[in-house]
Amino acid sequence: FHDCGVPLMLKRFPDYMTVLEEAYGSAGPEQRVVDTENRAFNTNHAVVGYYTAKSWRLPEHVTNAIANHHNALAIFSDESSRNSQLKNLLAILKMAEHICASYRVLGNQVEDHEWNSIGHLILDYVGLSDYDFENLKETVRELGAH
């Protein structure tokens, strides 16, 4: 549900998929996926998703996760942040997105540029090594859950 803003953006902006693919292609430490959308449309799917979730009266911690799901680098880089509920949701979400290869489906990319920027912070936060995460990813994919 965190990407519920994507179909709404598609409906409103005919060239949205082209911009989204560009956004995933240029994502990294210096540029978030939503920065490209903001430049093109003065809004982005995370903002639209946040307001959709609020209008559905979803809990605040869920709406905050939707709003911030492309702000993971800043959130996980800030060690003073005490918002463990947000970090927990985002950690699970970002690992799931990487395992399910959202960067291929939504961004038409062969590489997960966003994960390359944040993966080490996420895994450190949840206490997983790269090796453990690769095993988890393989297990999930073998179960057909990707």
Regions found by a protein language model. Give the residues of each.
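Metal-dependent nucleotide-binding catalytic modules
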Residues: 3-146
